[in-house]
Amino acid sequence: MATTLLIGSCEPFSGKSAVVLGLARLLGRQGVKVLFGKPLATTLQNPADAHGDRGGAVIDADVRFVGQTLGLADNQLIPSLHVLAPETAHARLLASDVGPGPGFEALREQLAAVPDGVALLEAAGSLHEGLLYGLSLGQLAEGLDAPVVLVHPWNDSCSIDSLLAAKAQLGHRLAGVVLNAVTPEDVPMLRAEVVPAIERLGLAVLGVMPRSPLLRSVTVEELARRLDAQVLCCRDRLDLLVETLSIGAMNVNSAMEFFRRRRNMAVVTGADRTDIQLAALEASTQCLILTGAGDPLTQLLNRAEELEVPLLKVEHDTLTTVEVIEQAFGHVRLHEAVKATYAVRLVEEHCDFSPLLTQLKLPAIAG
């Protein structure tokens, strides 16, 4: 029978998929068969996926990406039982339906039928998300009698409250936590002082992962979608990753000095600031976002085409544009190959799953 392990979090976009990728890769290298699924789907590639494929199976987009990245066969991808969406939530609420349905028993039977390996199941975004579907983290842990690893962003010592609340709810099923998105310069202090203190509270710390601009980055295509922007050039470069945001509102000399200190930027500036726009194109700029009235000069378009930097034109003012972009950082799915590769490396370098594997009676991972 396959061992089931739940990967959960106290809040959305905590880094669960990154940990799944890293842990699954490590298990695979040890010859352990890995299955992966999300009982409650949260991301679909298109609306038609909500009705299922492969004979009615609903496969979450995150599950598809992880499967493709790890080279998992179709029978190693576990279908979702329900789709988290306003429409399905409304229907269940009106029907006063808060049970997981017969699919949950089918999931248990499916896992029991697998002779060996590990089934990694990614829970919804928070401890309570999924209650309406009978598929919250606590319900899954109890219903499947499965241990839980929590991935939790660590800002400061106040971050412990959410973990203590999770421990109170999950009890002995909480097998360990991974502290994620830690300020890089704070990692040594956390390992030396904070981790021992957390473990004295009964929480096993399996890793301390530094914050990564790459993993928080967003594609130009995603920014264009969120901003409802007009793409003026370089549509074939919308897969570029934006790690930082710069606002071109200063004089051109100050702007050039500022731009030189940044990397992989999205630069937001007024459509009438051609001097700033041209300066930005000469820096580490992934896209140039023009706000306000007016069209860019032909000189700018030609230079952007030459340097293969997408130009976006938006109807929003600069403040609104900046707010939309800042909201996007760290709130996008891990669906790019370069991010997946980096996530695996982060987990390998900053996590030690040996205590967890001992608890699960699996072979220890060689260092």
Model features per residue range: what roles?
Residues H82-A85, A91-G99, P196-R216:
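Ligand-binding beta-strand-loop-alpha-helix segment within the catalytic cores
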Residues A91-Y133, G138-G143:
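Phosphate-binding/switch loop-helix module in NTP-utilizing enzymes
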Residues L5-C10, S14, A18-P102, A106, ...:
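N-terminal phosphate/diphosphate-binding loop that engages ATP/GTP or pyrophosphate donors
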Residues S9-C10, L23, P39-L40, S80-L81, ...:
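Fold-independent oxyanion-binding glycine-rich loops
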Residues V208-T269, A328-G367:
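Non-catalytic interface/targeting segments
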Residues A123-L203, D272-H335:
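Conserved catalytic-core segment of NTP-binding enzymes
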Residues T4-L5, K33-L35, R64, N75, ...:
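Structural motif
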Residues A112-P115, M256-M265, A280-S284:
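Flexible, charged surface loops at secondary-structure boundaries
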